[in-house]
UniProtKB/Swiss-Prot annotation:
Acts as a chaperone. Residues 604-619 have a biased composition (Low complexity). Disulfide bonds: none annotated. The keyword Transit peptide does not apply. CDD domains: ASKHA_NBD_HSP70_DnaK-like. The gene is dnaK. This is Chaperone protein DnaK. It comes from Nitrosospira multiformis (strain ATCC 25196 / NCIMB 11849 / C 71). Belongs to the heat shock protein 70 family. One of its GO terms (molecular function) is ATP-dependent protein folding chaperone. Residues 589-644 are annotated as: Disordered. The modification Phosphothreonine is found at residue 199. InterPro entries: ATPase_NBD, Chaperone_DnaK, Heat_shock_70_CS, HSP70_C_sf, HSP70_peptide-bd_sf, Hsp_70_fam. Induction: By stress conditions e.g. heat shock.
Amino acid sequence: MGKIIGIDLGTTNSCVAVMESGKPKVIENSEGARTTPSIVAYTEDGEILVGASAKRQAVTNPKNTLFAVKRLIGRRFNEEMVQRDIKMVPYTIIKADNNDAWIEVRGKKVAPPEVSAQVLMKMKKTAEDYLGEPVTEAVITVPAYFNDSQRQATKDAGRIAGLEVKRIINEPTAAALAFGMDKKEGDRKIAVYDLGGGTFDISIIEIAEVEGEHQFEVLATNGDTFLGGEDFDARIIEYLVDEFKKENGIDLKKDMLALQRLKDSAEKAKIELSSSQQTEVNLPYITADASGPKHLAVRITRAKLESLVEDLITRTVEPCRIAIKDAGIKISDIDDVILVGGQTRMPKVQEKVKEIFAKEPRKDVNPDEAVAVGAAIQGGVLQGAVKDVLLLDVTPLSLGIETLGGVMTKLIQKNTTIPTKANQVFSTADDNQTAVTIHVLQGEREMASGNKSLGQFNLADIPPAPRGMPQIEVTFDIDSNGILHVSAKDKATGKESKIKIQASSGLSEEEVQRMVKDAEAHAEEDHKAMELVTARNQCDAMIHSVQKTMKEHGDKLADEEKSKIESALKEAEDALKSGDKETIEAKTQALAEASHKLAEKMYSQGQGPQAGPGEEPSGQSGGTEKPVEGEVVDAEFEEVKNKK
């Protein structure tokens, strides 16, 4: 049975970990980094780049380099947050047929789960390379305050990436698992303050020893799914744009290339200002006008940055207060405050956390890795590799249905421990009503219109009766992933209608299947491309070897033999220009055979080690010779793309 990996699918960066010998291990990617930028780029020649390689080319390909896509996952196009993002990102956010926010790249419409799936595939490959075996199962984390549509969309992304998502768990809960696993200090209450690249969560969690078992119980959670490091970067970008406009009268917001360079610099400046008091943003040739090229040089102090983002930091205070109140505890009851997410490295954020909780936050948890580590531990729990751990998570928002007068009637209150089930009996609003529409909602507002619509379905064929007579039992069932299943049953007839909530938006089963097939086809393309590169490199090595040997020993051959080799060389060089693996392999083999005579001559004259462009000479056992040069594919070779 393969291992269940833990993936922190972040807005800005992602991370993967696995349980090994009873300990969680964060896995380094192919570039040697422990986190991978959650960036996906679509190149002109149809290649899809993920991670650092996508980030490196963002400046030259801004419209087709997608970052912070997690902020769009499970969201409608007309949501205020999405509209705000449209103004800030260089790529094109469009309205899909189902009213979701999708993205257009190189003339193709792409759903956010499809983009996130590319990041998950990179994480999957990272784990497979390390473990040396296929990985098919994962625990994926989401912000605690993600609603049902966003959780469902994240699960879809996992399926598209070829992963069976064994569990969706909340990021702060995962961080608490990472923090509390090795702590043997008895019962304690902790606050997890998670300010990441795109989302903010606060969870109050109780870690208790119950009959020798580590029990992690989430008491309350709150947050803001559109507040994070990306917003901090945006404030710096706005400031730089304003300063440049004051000085030069040019608005850089209209220049996609300049905007991408500003984004890079804003992120770097923000990071620098966590450890130094001031930094300078220098961007030569940022744009040009009739008078010539323009350069941007702006000094930013830590105090200036703090004034730019003060209101963003303040926005984290209210969710913290609500979570403490909902948990039914006092601030003084909290034993530890843990910081998660890269943005918590900012001194001003740490200061605010200290002010809210009246204690220094702990610094012994890695804010970038804790969530993936917790996901890996949960994977170990599900696999039975980690014993004596019980995780009790909650649903972040209340769930209910729309009733007469456009009111939301709640069936499950926020911060209810999951999995959970609740039912309530409703009736008809009109005489002889034969069908009812069950409109499922999520949120805290009294009126239905103020809450998130998760979907609706009908219960038909109700026998005609006076209003208020039929008894319709509505049941809400939340599974351990926090995903909702709803059913409605006419108690008189026993007729039942049920749905697994697939938001009125969201991807249909057919769309998910199509995307899974696309991803598989792409993986097959990558495999074929890799085989072609290998064939080209082997052919190039053979050509190089034969040419070298011909130069040194060609005079020992008869003219006929020489022209045979030269002809095979020419054919191999021509084959290299093609993109046909079979042709390249055939011509490589033909060249090896044609140069056979040359190899024989070299060996017979005691020149064996230098002469081997092709196969072993006849009569040799081959057991003790050095490797034949033409058969060695040097690791330094790169794909040879001869221009026609």
